């Protein structure tokens, strides 16, 4: 199973903390956010990861290298110029199989990625989005439902 993790952003909303370290590398306890995500993905059956890097790419390469010490095969897709989620996917698409996970590298969750992936394949869905219903209004990442499983 493969995952494309988007880690190329500048983390501007967290400045000054992200001035010298990208948000996915910020520590939570004794590990970085991205280390926690990689462990969760590995536990869910992911064995190959492509990191879509941009901002401070050298830090990701230096720390994660080929992924061997994390029990994963990690490669890198380099964005010279940030082109958003679609641009990062387009740049890495030749390395990915038909079904793969795309996720942000700064989002911690208890989602079972393996279970979601199996459900996606079982339904032969064109795409599957993991979301969390909130009552608190937010300015970004808003999803509206038509039914329980269909989006507007």
Regions found by a protein language model. Name each.
Residues 2-5, 27, 31-104, 113-115:
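Conserved N-terminal catalytic core of the sugar/cofactor nucleotidyltransferase
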Residues 1-19, 42:
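N-terminal nucleotide-binding beta1-loop-alpha1 segment
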Residues 15, 23-26:
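Pre-signature/interface helix of ABC/ABC-like ATPase nucleotide-binding domains
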Residues 20-23, 72:
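A short helix-loop-beta submotif of the ANL/AMP-binding
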Residues 10, 106-107:
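Active-site metal-binding loops of divalent metal-dependent hydrolases
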Residues 110-152:
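Conserved core of the sugar-phosphate nucleotidyltransferase
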Residues 8, 54, 132-133:
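Histidine-centered beta-alpha loop that forms part of the nucleotide-sugar donor binding/catalytic region
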Residues 16, 81, 132-134:
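Short Gly/Pro-enriched turn/cap motifs at secondary-structure boundaries
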């Amino acid at each position: 199973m493969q995952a494309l993790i988007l880690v190329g952003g500048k983390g501007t909303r967290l400045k000054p903390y992200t001035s010298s370290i990208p948000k996915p590398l910020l520590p939570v306890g004794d590990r970085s956010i991205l280390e926690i995500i990689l462990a969760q993905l590995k536990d869910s059956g992911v064995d190959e990861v492509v990191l879509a890097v941009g901002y401070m790419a050298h830090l990701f390469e230096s720390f994660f290298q080929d992924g061997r010490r994390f029990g994963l095969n990690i490669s890198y897709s380099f964005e010279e110029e940030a082109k958003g989620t679609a641009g990062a996917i387009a740049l890495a698409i030749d390395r990915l199989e038909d079904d793969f996970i795309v996720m942000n590298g700064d989002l911690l969750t208890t989602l079972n990625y393996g279970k979601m992936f199996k459900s996606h394949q079982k339904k032969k869905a064109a795409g599957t989005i993991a979301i969390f219903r909130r009552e608190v209004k937010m300015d970004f990442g808003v999803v509206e439902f038509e039914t329980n499983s269909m989006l507007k």
